[in-house]
A protein has these predicted regions:
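Conserved, structured core segments of small domains
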Residues: 47, 52-70, 75-80, 106, ...
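Active-site beta-strand termini and strand-to-loop segments that position acidic
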Residues: 46-49, 111-114, 124
Length: 129
């Protein structure tokens, strides 16, 4: 490891297993307002704000279950939005779904992407002038 403030490595991108990478790339590009920079049957990639997310085809892919008491959830993305209800409605219109179990008590919202993987919506922090 480097000295305090220095890093040994830099994150270049995140890759996520998927049943249908092209579909997931289209979904997240629309959800985030990013660009699909690569897409075929085995891999999809989106990019925006200097961040890349890749989606790789995994035969027999099974998404995490939500809620999952067994702890099989592998990861989740947190997306900040201006309005939870409006964002959830917009994302469901392009392929997300909203499970019944919502642990956030209105502080955040859990949705499932088109592959069934959970992700969360949380309010964008207020900025002070």
């Amino acid at each position: 490891m480097g000295k305090r403030g220095e890093s040994t490595a830099a994150l270049s991108m995140v890759n996520i297993d998927s049943a249908d990478p092209a579909r997931l790339a289209r979904f997240y590009a629309a959800a985030l307002g990013w660009e699909v920079t690569y897409s075929d049957d085995s891999y999809g990639m989106v990019e925006g704000n200097g961040i890349k997310i890749g989606f790789g085809k995994v035969e027999g892919f099974r998404p995490a279950q939500w809620p999952d008491e067994a702890g099989a959830k592998r990861f989740h993305l947190d997306l900040q939005v201006d309005d939870l209800d409006e964002a959830a409605e917009s994302l469901c219109a392009i392929g997300a779904s909203q499970p019944d179990f919502q642990p956030g008590a209105g502080r955040w919202r859990v949705l499932l992407d088109p592959d069934g993987q959970p992700f969360c919506l949380s309010p964008r922090p207020a900025t002070t002038p």
